[in-house]
Amino acid sequence: MAKKSMIERERKREELVSKYEKKRLELKSKLKKTAEYEEKLEVYKKIQEIPRNAFPSRLRNRCWVTGRSRGYYRDFGLSRHVLREMVHDCLLPGVTKSSW
């Protein structure tokens, strides 16, 4: 299981991303529309004033059971360890172990 502090930090990042999403998109569209160099510099400065953790690229996918960030399966929102256990316990319908 991941440290509680890491999970909490990730949750706070998600809140920041949703809080500043509208402002960030407005500034990005302004940046594309403006042609003058000075205006672009002003917009860049405003973008840089947004907190670092408010950008979606700072987010990391985490397993909702353990909080593990590596070995994450997007389809299920689970890490590989939990996915394997749930498949063996028949908790994920339609998922079968492959054999060839």
From Swiss-Prot:
Organism listed in the record: Guillardia theta
Subcellular location: Plastid, Chloroplast
InterPro entries per the UniProt record, alphabetical: Ribosomal_uS14, Ribosomal_uS14_bac/plastid, Ribosomal_uS14_CS
HAMAP family attached to this UniProt entry: Ribosomal_uS14_1
Similarity remark: Belongs to the universal ribosomal protein uS14 family.
Membrane-crossing residue ranges in chain numbering: none
Name of the protein in question: Small ribosomal subunit protein uS14c
GO molecular function: rRNA binding; structural constituent of ribosome
Major place of residence: plastid
Family matches, as Gene3D superfamilies: 1.10.287.1480
Role according to the record: Binds 16S rRNA, required for the assembly of 30S particles.
Domain of life: Eukaryota
Quaternary structure, from the entry: Part of the 30S ribosomal subunit.
NCBIfam families attached to this UniProt entry: PRK08881.1
Disulfide bonds, paired cysteine numbers: none
GO BP terms: translation
Annotated GO CC locations: chloroplast; small ribosomal subunit
Keywords of the record: Chloroplast, Plastid, Ribonucleoprotein, Ribosomal protein, RNA-binding, rRNA-binding
